[in-house]
Regions:
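Second-shell loop/turn segments in exported
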Residues: 120-129, 142-155, 179-181, 220-231, ...
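Active-site-adjacent substrate-binding region
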Residues: 299-407
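Solvent-exposed loop/turn segments at secondary-structure junctions
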Residues: 146-149, 183-187, 197-200, 211-215, ...
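A non-catalytic alpha/beta surface segment that caps or lines the substrate-entry region
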Residues: 136-196
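Acidic/histidine-rich catalytic neighborhood of metal-dependent amide-processing enzymes
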Residues: 187-189, 221-313, 317, 338, ...
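N-terminal hydrophobic or amphipathic helices/low-complexity stretches enriched
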Residues: 94-151, 406-407
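N-terminal accessory interaction module
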Residues: 22-103
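Structural recognition of the beta-strand scaffold that forms the well-ordered cores
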Residues: 134-142, 190-194, 204-208, 227, ...
Length: 407
């Protein structure tokens, strides 16, 4: 990895750093990120934990941009969480709490393997998902010039999605509510669709993906960030899953679908939502995160299963869902801290899981640029498996008593 990091900075020194207004502001940030990468970009380390390879670091916007690009050069995602003002006074305590939380969640890995019974109706509903319709939805989402959370008008696509969801869900067998969540850390809003549980409404299953995009390319039009793979794909998987679930009965548990704001700037929307959930002692049983599902870099129907900062219990359940219904090939992989919104939930002690389009070393390298568009390198048949994961995650966990073991 050190060789890759040195090569990355040699490349920067030879090409120069072209930075757009989207990427730099006057305000530095204090973030939670991987220790080795914070050091590599020259960040000021406020606290560190070598055993976790994590650091609370003070970074300029230029350094944050370099951090994101460094992660991509290593086959990783952006890899940081922007911390709130009330979290930065005691960075050492923050890291210690995360270490305890991580150990507690991973202790569940000592439990036995989950084996699901096949359900004909669940398979029928999962089979309603359509790769062609998925492509149409990704095309619509990626048609916006950008979905950047710091753009002058960061919410047009958000408001449009709220309108579309209300239209698409007409005829569902269950009641639903679509609302917009306002944030402190960004002007962009998060979209939430809630399906109340029939018998256990206080037990919540969360399914989410980020709805923003960003362009960090060296050249070209910096205002153009179509984000077809990152993350119109995961956003569209959730939409298409809901369309299939319209034919299902009302779930026993409450389902909450999120299209998060500001992930590309440090998990902004999901961090606030997960913190509020913990503060209110919300009984979130499980969290599924879908982020980048279109590029079959490791082969068709080869899916990366992120093992760091995720729940062994939920990975076990997702593996059983896959083996029972989807039949893709799952490959364990790591993506580092903060590679997507599941990290926000994990840090608050909730069980989260995230399948990925490939192993990170063979992920789509066109993301965060104007080249992240629909082209022949993408596979909607491949991505449709992730729509099925969302459908089955909602059905299996939304209609059962499954919950993390307690030790």
């Amino acid at each position: 990895m050190l060789i890759n990091i040195l090569f990355y900075f040699l490349t920067l020194s030879l090409t120069g750093t072209v930075v757009s207004a989207h990427e730099v502001s006057e305000k530095p940030e204090i973030v939670l990120t991987n220790l080795d990468q914070a050091v590599a970009v020259g960040g000021v380390i406020l606290s560190k934990d070598k055993s976790l390879n994590l650091a609370v670091s003070y970074l300029t916007q230029l350094q944050l941009n370099q951090l994101s690009k460094l992660n991509h050069s290593l086959g990783k995602c952006a890899g940081f969480e922007t911390l709130a003002a009330n979290e930065i006074n005691q960075p050492g305590i923050l890291l210690e709490k995360l270490k305890v939380t991580d150990l507690k969640i991973n202790k569940v890995g000592l439990s036995r393997t989950s084996i699901l019974e096949f359900n004909d109706d669940y398979q029928r509903i999962a089979n309603l998902t359509d790769p062609v319709q998925l492509q149409n939805t990704v095309k619509w989402i990626s048609s916006y010039p950008n979905r950047y959370n710091k753009a002058p008008s960061p919410n047009q696509h958000v408001v449009d999605l709220q309108t579309k969801l209300n239209e698409w869900m007409v005829g569902a067998k269950w009641k639903f509510d679509v609302n917009l969540i306002t944030h402190q850390s960004t002007n962009q809003k998060t979209v939430r669709l809630t399906i109340p549980g029939k018998t256990k409404p206080n037990e919540v299953i969360v399914l989410g993906g980020h709805y923003d995009s960003v362009n960090q390319g060296f050249f070209g039009n910096k205002d153009k960030a179509p984000g077809a793979d990152d993350n119109a794909s995961g956003s569209a998987n959730l939409i298409e899953a809901l369309k299939a679930l319209k034919s299902a009965e009302q779930p026993q548990r409450t389902l909450e679908f999120y299209w998060y704001a500001g992930e590309e700037s440090g998990l902004l929307g999901s961090a606030e939502i997960a913190k509020e959930a913990k503060a209110k002692n919300k009984n979130v049983i499980a969290v599924l995160q879908l982020d980048m599902t279109l590029f079959p870099g490791s082969g068709e129907q080869v899916v990366g299963l992120v093992t760091d900062y995720t729940s062994p219990w939920l990975r076990d359940i997702l593996t059983s869902i896959n083996n029972t219904y989807v039949k893709a090939r799952l490959v364990d992989d790591e993506c580092g801290y903060g590679c997507s919104d599941h990290a926000s939930w994990h840090r608050q002690g909730y069980h989260a899981v995230t399948p990925f389009e490939a192993v990170t070393s063979t992920m789509n390298r066109n993301i965060h640029s104007e080249k992240d568009v629909i082209d022949t390198s993408l596979s909607f048949q491949h991505s449709n498996s992730f729509t099925k994961y969302a459908v089955l995650f909602a059905l299996v966990l939304g209609n059962s008593d499954l919950r993390p073991p307690v030790f």
